[in-house]
From Swiss-Prot:
This is Venom allergen 5. Its main location: secreted. Expressed by the venom gland. Keywords: Allergen, Disulfide bond, Secreted, Signal. It is found in: Secreted. It comes from the Eukaryota. It comes from Vespa magnifica. It holds the Pfam family CAP.
Length: 225
């Protein structure tokens, strides 16, 4: 269905290179800065959006499967050297790239953060197992409808058009979602979302957490074949 009205999409990425403890108590898990999301807000995923009108919280099983499928199909495409886009393209094939699996702990942390209706990155989201990276997106429209999660994931993947493998001139703000999506060493993903109305805008906010984190220093996104 075509969405009428004015639509814009905001994307932010981040570089994560954080330490973590083995403790299950999230208040004891250390990050570069800030308090862990589950320590600060608790484990409840109940929306905490103030005066904003919440229209939907959490991902359906079908949406979770679609997000995972999109990521793995795109990772496979890049790894096989079939991605022709780039600056310049094509992207080189990879020696190896993990197949992502869904992680409920990462998803819970993502959902708790999404449920705050505060667009931006949380300060600390590590687990006892992993340093954790994050992609976020928010689609907003004046129409009485909400964009799909698959559209937002596709926007992350489409950043490949700005990426040159191995170049030091890549700008994270332009390619950071793509590089996290195809970070070869990442093994797990978990996401959360919320739909709400704010000052007449229908907003759909998606948060995806990745473990272990990508976008680490000067490491390559993957080793080319």
């Amino acid at each position: 269905m075509k969405i009428s009205g004015f639509v814009y999409l905001i994307l932010i990425t981040t570089i994560i290179n954080l330490s973590f403890s083995e403790a299950n108590n999230y208040c004891k898990i250390k990050c570069r800065s800030g308090i862990h999301t589950l320590c600060k807000f608790g484990i409840s995923t109940k929306p905490n959006c103030g005066k904003n009108v919440v229209k939907g919280s959490g991902l359906t099983k079908a949406e979770k499967l679609e997000i995972l499928k999109q990521h793995n199909e795109f990772r496979q495409k890049v790894a096989r050297g079939l991605e022709t886009r780039g600056k310049p393209g094509p992207q080189p094939p990879a020696k190896s790239m993990n197949t992502l699996v869904w992680n409920d702990e990462l998803a819970q942390i993502a959902q708790v953060w999404a449920s705050q209706c505060k667009y931006g990155h949380d300060d600390c989201r590590n687990t006892a197992k992993h340093s954790v990276g994050q992609n976020i997106a928010q689609q907003s429209t004046t129409a009485a409808s909400f964009g799909s999660v698959s559209n937002m994931v596709q926007m992350w993947a489409d950043e490949v058009k700005n990426y040159q493998y191995g170049s030091t001139k890549n700008k994270l703000i332009e390619v950071g979602h793509y590089t996290q999506m195809v970070w070869a060493k990442t093994k797990e993903i978990g996401c959360g979302s919320i739909k709400y109305i704010e000052n007449g805008w229908h907003r759909h906010y998606l948060v995806c957490n990745y473990g272990p984190a990508g976008n680490i220093g000067n490491e390559p996104i993957y080793e080319k074949k």
